């Protein structure tokens, strides 16, 4: 058993790549170690293309084992179940990083599995998994010539931090992951605290500069440990077939792409496709028999060439816009009467209905990970039903990877402006229902989420808007597109989503389909996105630019009280009897903590006020010189103890009672008296006198 090893440094941390010791029946197998973190990444490549496959079936699975952190899973079965949303997001991150490096037309199935075997809690294993995926591919024999690497970058006090640990990220204004090849950037994923575009661009370039060290190490490992290159074929469009279709139908296709409406355009194109199939099947084009798949692939290639060439030649886009024009926007808030907050955001043929719901601490999501159980106060969910694109399909199923990814992007975009628990004790759930989609539904979700939360009275620091940028590139010629359509995303070379406030960027997500882009293109895309974002924010601000001061009449009420910690036991009562009584009488939900914090959550203001008043009565402190009504709770030889505020007793001597003209032999327990607080000594003992009748 021969083991090969490569060692390099990343941000003053030693990273070790090793192959030959584990999972040797996989085509590629690499362990990546940093400190006590160990990730095993395997690659298996099918040696032939499955019948009927007309796409690249790459699948990436990132898995965390609880034993890696010395823990036993929860649940009845006590074993790992389906991947968490975080694991799915990391799987997508790896997939998006490596997919552009494969040749067009390569359709062999590839499966990559990254398994976290050991975890020290200091660093997230996601970057190790990404590096391991690239290394295992490089030695697997797959056609993977442009080796990819990825790094994370933070930004604190005006300085970039390479490979930050989790504590660094907590103090950082930026969490940026960049992947790419030696000479090109392929993928960007980030969350930021409204940073300027210049800082974001600087972070991307800083990250790319440090990829070379990782790539060189992977190449050295591949040089000594790589398997022979597999034999594979590349699917190619039949050029003669394409020319025949173009000669007969190009004029019709060209006219179809002048129709701005997506539905009308698709109806026209479907009719042309039907005619193309009939023409090819009924005529002896060149003596060959073509399949429907081959014909439609050639037709699609003509569409792609047409749309791209029109844009590069400066002609109007599919819907008649120029490269920088944003589609018409319509904004409405408060569109649903029975919810806590709502917004309907429409941009062209993309529409998001976004609803905000307020809840208490008990509604917070508990997220289990290798770090333990974390309470999540802000949830954002994204739903993409089939009717949004005029199709039939499965409804009510678990969210797909794409839906999870879009929800995460929108949440990261708005996380920077979301209030902390001290400022806003509510738990918030935002749901985006995509009602129509023709490009950029995730950015519509960002805009709608900001509007919906402001409508619900959530005190977000600033409104947030998002825009999706595209790219058409052919050699040295290129065009950056603002607010891309679905077809422009599908037929273009880049999907670059930018979200932020008027002050700066809060989230970036970039995916490239070509072999990377230059600094010049990045700068133009960021600047064009900034102009588009400010335009969208201006329209949103005309409807609502600050959160509503009060929550909706149908929203629950929440009140936070900070009382003397010693009084918590009085609020709770013996065996919880007191707090249960308040809950039963008012219908409110009450949470207490040993620090003295009491949270009261009620369905309406009346229940809230009643519960707060009852708690205030229990925890109220008596004051010298004040008169109180109390009840005798204990008789002594020299006087009586009188309960004043439910939780505090005072001593009333018989001499004071007699001085007020009352006979002491008539006193009984439970009898009501009106008393004056004469004195409270250092020990908290209260001396009373009787108020004369």
Swiss-Prot record:
Residues 556-615 form the KH domain. The keyword RNA-binding applies. Keywords: Cytoplasm, Magnesium, Metal-binding, Nucleotidyltransferase, RNA-binding, Transferase. Residues 625-693 form the S1 motif domain. Its main location: cytoplasm. It catalyses: RNA(n+1) + phosphate = RNA(n) + a ribonucleoside 5'-diphosphate. GO terms for molecular function: 3'-5'-RNA exonuclease activity; magnesium ion binding; polyribonucleotide nucleotidyltransferase activity; RNA binding. GO terms for biological process: mRNA catabolic process; RNA processing. Its EC number is 2.7.7.8. Component of the RNA degradosome, which is a multiprotein complex involved in RNA processing and mRNA degradation. Involved in mRNA degradation. Catalyzes the phosphorolysis of single-stranded polyribonucleotides processively in the 3'- to 5'-direction. Belongs to the polyribonucleotide nucleotidyltransferase family. This is Polyribonucleotide nucleotidyltransferase.
